[in-house]
Amino acid sequence: GRGRTGKIKITLDTEKLPKLGLTTASVYLSRFLGDKVGEENEIPVSAVLLPDFSHISQQERLNPPAIHLSAEELQMGELESDEKKAHTIIIKNVGKSNLEIRDLQVFNSALGVQLKKRVLKPGASTKLKITAFGQNLKKVKGTPRVLMITNDPNNPKIIIKVKVTSKK
């Protein structure tokens, strides 16, 4: 009846996820055949799939790539709805083997990303340009973020926070 609580167990088969990084979906509850789908019975579900490092060789384990970012948080301040602002982050491979940026995702439409190179040799660097769009900021809940998935076993998931708000 109403006001009672219960538990729902949701199982995720990671083998069936389409790619590394963020995957979001909704699970809808229904009590009766023909129940309508809506916000009242929606359970949003999200998962971040990371690379599996359990099969890497001893050689790879001793000589891993290592990512270094010039910043993991950007301060962009306030934007008008017709304004956009961009910042560039330098990504450097300070490790001993090739660094792969396997996936790059934004958590919402207020941000855009451009990456020059996805594979960096040891010692090499590249530029990641992050742009905030004022017209899409009003829809954003929380802090806009960029998700990066790499083959660095110590940093397979990097989240870059972008501190930006829309002017009222």
Describe these PLM feature segments:
Residues 13, 30-34, 133, 149-153:
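Beta-strand-rich extracellular modules
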